[in-house]
From Swiss-Prot:
It catalyses: NAD(+) + (deoxyribonucleotide)n-3'-hydroxyl + 5'-phospho-(deoxyribonucleotide)m = (deoxyribonucleotide)n+m + AMP + beta-nicotinamide D-nucleotide. Signal peptide: none annotated. Keywords: DNA damage, DNA repair, DNA replication, Ligase, Magnesium, Manganese, Metal-binding, NAD, Zinc. NAD(+) binds at residues 35-39, 83-84, 147, 181, 317. Gene3D superfamilies: 5' to 3' exonuclease, C-terminal subdomain, BRCT domain, DNA ligase/mRNA capping enzyme, Helix hairpin bin, Nucleic acid-binding proteins. The active site is at 125 (n6-amp-lysine intermediate). GO terms for biological process: DNA repair; DNA replication. It comes from Clostridium acetobutylicum (strain ATCC 824 / DSM 792 / JCM 1419 / IAM 19013 / LMG 5710 / NBRC 13948 / NRRL B-527 / VKM B-1787 / 2291 / W). This is DNA ligase 2. Its EC number is 6.5.1.2. GO terms for cellular component: cytosol. The lineage of its organism: Bacteria, Bacillati, Bacillota, Clostridia, Eubacteriales. GO terms for molecular function: DNA binding; DNA ligase (NAD+) activity; metal ion binding. Its cofactor is Mg(2+); Mn(2+). It is an enzyme of class 6 (ligase).
Length: 669
């Protein structure tokens, strides 16, 4: 073997290794090699490719995207990519199901080779760009194309190769076309927009715009992902069912979404649609519905197609989470930290089943980057049940528009506004009503000092009528003063005084949280207490000591240090302690058990625990409770309708416990 042959052999070894590493990292979310080791092999491959002048089409070096194309070429799909019929209501799903039942019954009454009972498979309907990847007899991806008309699409092979989860070579000996959806995750979207001169307006446009960009380097910058869900053209062994076909896709190394649900009844389908709708906002990518297909391929063949759609599939569409409307005005609001933030007043628009009239604009820098003006038509997005956000302006804005101007004085107290970084602040912390009211409400809230019977209306009256100017003033209020307020009689006043008095003896984590330290939530407050054991230790902790605490980074550490440096905070704390507030810390002794130090995920509906209760129970056992399943998860506790987290646990080989097994374990400790 000469040197060139030896180099080529080594290149093929490296390509196989690197593609295996990429599959484990990007598809299974289970890295099997350190980044440094991957980079070492990758650099060796680059060097050998330069030396030999050979680059194989399935080499990972093709994913860099270092090319600018002159134009898109047309590509004729080997098999048509069908659109799906769509249902906006569940009644339409029932009608579709009844048509299927009738057709199958008619066939079975006239044929001896009976069709099986109807079984459906449900998948998420991804909101991205459909792609069709073609692999030759050697298993090499030779083409990737958009759906286009369904018959003819556009060649996006170079762009698709930048999606690291798409295999460039599969172990298959026949020509096959595999259909998927290219998507942009919310994580990738947010990372891209941090640095983008012109921010992306939504995830779908982010994915579609990347794949239809002739500058492939720009495609690579957007860090797209993909899920695959269908085989179109296939010269290999025919599939008998959708589930068999999906197993083939998985075995070939394609990224497949963890949610894949088999249903036998219309009631099960309805339950699953509701489940996917419930988890929709918690996903890291956009979906706009659920796809329902018949599993059996013989039944599919018998039902056939309309001019536009297959009769054996339908898509249930969710309410839109994104819409366009007109920006009517901007209102400036003050938070408890003194930050003055813009809120958009919108022409009312329906979004995810809710009428939306207001949306966040973040800050003036964000307004400038998105080119938003009063009178503009804007994209509005709602997710995670939070206040909707304006993502950008549409191209069809008509009529007069006006620049949004930042205020120079506080809209509530008239004090001068100062700019710190990208944010505006009112520094009048003592007599600016929104700041004081919101600080008191936060201090008294259930997770903080837990003062029962305290409300925002009460806080407003305390500020306006009793001249309360700090949280310590709460502990100076008398019953007689409370009875001078609206709707306060003897009993209500007594109850609130007793609740305020009772709050003086509080656990340390609740007290730390009640102070409203920027970027410190209840979990961070709890972590601080576990680490430092006393309030005095937390207060005097240095930056270097703070960043050693689990989940505390530089921003949170700086916030804590700066907070305790302030003279007004020192004064307020001293007053609270003088008035009898005595936070205490009790270190709960955790007996070594099966869950100590383990990462646990609870999913589905549990019979004996609410979400909060199971979280508290696990934490009391010394477990770390996580919200998603990964290779670092030790246990998954699965209740009814466990769904995608259960599926991922099975895929990764994570130990799964039923609620009964969990209780048996803790009862035997």
């Amino acid at each position: 073997m000469n040197e060139k042959e030896s180099n080529i052999l080594r290149m093929q070894e490296l390509i196989e290794e690197l593609n295996k590493y990429s599959y484990s990292y990007y598809v299974l979310d289970n890295p099997i090699v350190a980044d440094k080791e991957y980079d070492k092999r990758y650099d060796e491959l680059v060097e050998l490719e330069e030396k030999t002048g050979i680059t194989y089409p399935y080499s990972p070096t093709n994913r860099v995207g270092d090319v600018i194309l002159k134009q898109f070429q047309k590509y004729t799909h080997k098999s048509r990519l069908w659109s799906l019929d769509k249902a906006q209501s569940f009644e339409e799903i029932i009608d579709w199901h009844n048509r299927n039942k009738k057709a199958v019954a008619e066939y079975n009454s006239n044929h001896e080779d009976k069709l099986p009972e109807l079984k459906y498979v449900l998948t998420k309907k991804f909101d991205g760009l459909t792609i069709n990847c073609t692999y030759d007899e050697s298993g090499v991806m030779i083409k990737a194309a958009t759906r286009g008309t369904g018959v003819i699409g556009e060649d996006i092979t170079s762009q698709a190769k930048t999606i690291k989860s798409i295999p460039l070579k599969i172990k298959n000996g026949s020509v096959v076309e595999v259909h998927g959806e290219a998507i942009m995750t919310k994580t990738a979207f947010n990372e891209y927009n941090k640095k983008a001169e012109v921010p992306l307006k939504n995830l779908r446009n982010g994915a579609a715009g990347a794949l239809r960009n002739l500058n492939v380097r720009e495609t690579a910058r957007r860090n797209l992902s993909a899920f695959f869900y269908d085989v179109g053209y296939n010269e290999g062994k025919a599939f008998k069912s959708y589930m068999e076909m999906m197993n083939f896709i998985k075995e070939m190394g394609f990224p497949v979404d963890e949610y894949l649900k088999e249903c036998n009844t219309i009631e099960e389908i309805n339950k699953e649609i509701q489940y996917v709708g419930d988890i929709r906002s918690s996903l890291d990518y956009d979906i706009d519905g659920v796809v329902i297909v018949i599993d059996d391929y013989r039944t599919r063949e018998y039902l056939g197609y309309t001019v536009k759609f297959p009769k054996w599939a339908i898509a249930y569409k969710f309410e839109a989470e994104e819409a366009t409307t007109k920006l009517l005005d901007v209102e400036w609001n003050v938070g408890r930290s003194g930050r003055v933030s813009p809120t958009a007043i919108l022409e009312p628009v329906e979004l995810a089943g809710v009428i939306v009239k207001r949306a966040t604009l973040n800050n003036m820098d964000d307004i400038g980057r998105k080119k938003v003006k009063i009178g503009s038509r804007v994209f509005v997005r709602r997710s995670n049940d939070v206040i909707p956000e304006i993502m950008g302006v549409t191209e069809e804005t008509e009529g007069e528009t006006n620049e949004i101007e930042a205020p120079t004085i506080c809209p509530y107290c008239g004090s001068e506004i100062v700019k710190e970084g990208v944010h505006l602040f009112c520094e009048n912390t003592l007599s600016c009503k929104p700041q004081m009211v919101k600080s008191i409400v936060h201090f008294a809230s259930r997770e903080a000092m837990n003062i029962e019977g305290f409300s925002e209306k009460t806080a407003e009256q305390l500020f306006e009528k009793l001249n309360i100017k700090s949280i310590s003033d709460l502990y100076r209020i008398t019953k007689e003063e409370l009875m001078s307020l609206d709707k306060f009689k003897d009993k209500k006043a007594s109850n609130l005084i007793n609740a305020i008095e009772k709050s003086k003896k509080c656990d340390l984590a609740s007290f730390v949280y009640s102070l409203g330290i920027p970027n410190v939530g209840k979990k961070t407050a709890t972590d601080l207490c576990k680490q430092f054991k006393s309030f005095e230790n937390i207060k005097k902790a240095s930056y270097d000591e703070l960043i050693l605490v689990q989940d505390i980074g530089s921003i949170v550490a700086e916030s804590i240090v700066e907070f305790f440096k302030q003279e007004k905070i020192e004064k307020s704390l001293n007053e609270l302690f003088e008035l009898g507030v005595t936070p205490f810390y009790e270190e709960s002794e955790v007996v070594e058990n099966a869950f100590t130090g383990k990462t646990v995920v609870a999913t589905g509906t549990l019979q004996n625990y609410s979400r909060t209760a199971i979280k508290e129970k696990l934490e009391s056992l010394g477990a770390n409770v996580a919200g998603s399943v990964s290779k670092k998860t030790d246990y998954v506790i699965a209740g009814e309708n466990a769904g995608s987290k259960y599926d991922k646990a099975v895929q990764l080989g994570v130990k799964i416990l039923t609620e009964e097994e969990f209780e048996q374990l803790i009862n035997n400790m």
